[in-house]
Amino acid sequence: LIAATIVASPVAAQKPKLGQRTAPPEKSMAGIGEGSSDAEVAQELAAAANFPVGTLQNPVRVAGPEGERAYLARLRCSDGTGARVGAQRPGGTDSFGNVADLAPVDCGGAAPAHADILIDVYQEEHVLEAAPAGFQLAPR
C-alpha cells in the first residue's frame, strides 16, 4: 500500500492540461493556408524535370480524380492502342509531398508491356502533356 502511494504521488501531482490553452491562437494558426511561393514551386518543378515522367520523383501531375481519369484515358501504348489500367492504389509520397496514386498499366504485346505510373492528383489547374517513356498521349 505504501509503495502504491509513493508511485502514484507524482502522477497525482501533475495537473492535466485538459481545457487549457497550450499556445496562443496566432501561433497555432501560423502558416496555415500560406502554400508555396512561386519560386518554391519553380524549384520543385525544375528538380522533378530531372527524372522520368510517372515516377515518385516526377509524377504525372493532374487536377483531381477527374484529371487522373482523363489523362489515363488519353494514354496510348507504342502501337497506338489504349493502355489497360489496373486497380489504382497509394504509391508513396512524391517529390511534391503528396501521396501519389500508383496506376498499373498494361499494353499486352505492345511496348511497353507493363508499367507502374505514379500520379499526383493534387496539382490543381495542371494538365500534363507529356507521357511516360514508351507511351503516347492521344490528342484531346
Segment roles from a protein language model:
Residues 15-99, 107-140:
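N-terminal secretory-pathway/extracellular module detecting exported/lumenal segments
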